[in-house]
Amino acid sequence: MLENVKKSLFRVLCLGALCLGGLMAEQDPKELVGLGAKSYKEQDFTQAKKYFEKACDLKENSGCFNLGVLYYQGHGVEKNLKKAASFYSKACDLNYSNGCHLLGNLYYSGQGVSQNTNKALQYYSKACDLKYAEGCASLGGIYHDGKVVTRDFKKAVEYFTKACDLNDGDGCTILGSLYDAGRGTPKDLKKALASYDKACDLKDSPGCFNAGNMYHHGEGAAKNFKEALARYSKACELENGGGCFNLGAMQYNGEGATRNEKQAIENFKKGCKLGAKGACDILKQLKIKV
């Protein structure tokens, strides 16, 4: 669940682009970030760096963050993870939530800094406190996996709940799985289904698949083939092989809709291409080439 750095930068750039306007007579820091964003989009990374440096010197947190990303990526500067960590740290000190999160990533993996799990947890925690969903999800993942700390499902539930409340789809899916299994919380299939459904609404394909399974088998709600079909369909649209396979099976059997063998076979083919072994097996049984 570690953040894709490039995607993070584009989020900031999109925000920064809203700040464009005029020449920099007053050196407004947010406007400097906007000009840096414009230069970045034009692939003038050297100029972008200058604007971000000025903004950071004026204690504009997103300017410091963007400088960190430039050093992490090596755009307009020589790649330097130590400097990336330094600028993420400045951004975090100025309460830029994703700066805290990415600094946590560096401490977790030991990139540009000495590996330090406690510091990673510290920065993920600050990101989460600043309502950055992926910071909460990263904490949840650490306590869920138990690789670098003692496994604690109760804490995992706590942090995945926060992540889900902040609309992190993956966090909602994992929260649903914890309710489903009764780990760190009493088993509650209704809450599991609600979490999977929210994940699906947030376009998390495993959430759609899991919600489909629950509606299909009547877990957490009355059995409802129509709802199951809708969730499997969305999972398949989101490139989930199991979703395509189950969607095809329901169409082949006429569950939730009129039987449609042609469409079922198309979904079996898609599921097989996406790695669903069951879909490949049924195509072999039907003597249909992928």
Swiss-Prot record:
Entry GO CC: extracellular region
Protein's name in the database: Putative beta-lactamase HcpC
TPR repeats: 29-62, 64-98, 100-133, 134-170, 172-205, 206-242, 244-278
Any one GO molecular-function label of the UniProt entry: beta-lactamase activity
Subcellular location, record wording: Secreted
Highest rank taxon of the organism: Bacteria
EC number: 3.5.2.6
Signal peptide feature range: 1-25
Functional note: May hydrolyze 6-aminopenicillinic acid and 7-aminocephalosporanic acid (ACA) derivatives.
Family: Belongs to the hcp beta-lactamase family.
Keywords of this entry: Antibiotic resistance, Disulfide bond, Hydrolase, Repeat, Secreted, Signal, TPR repeat
SMART domains: SEL1 (SM00671), TPR (SM00028)
Biological process, per Gene Ontology: response to antibiotic
Reaction catalyzed: a beta-lactam + H2O = a substituted beta-amino acid
Residue pairs linked by disulfide bridges in the UniProt entry: C56-C64, C92-C100, C128-C136, C164-C172, C200-C208, C236-C244, C272-C280
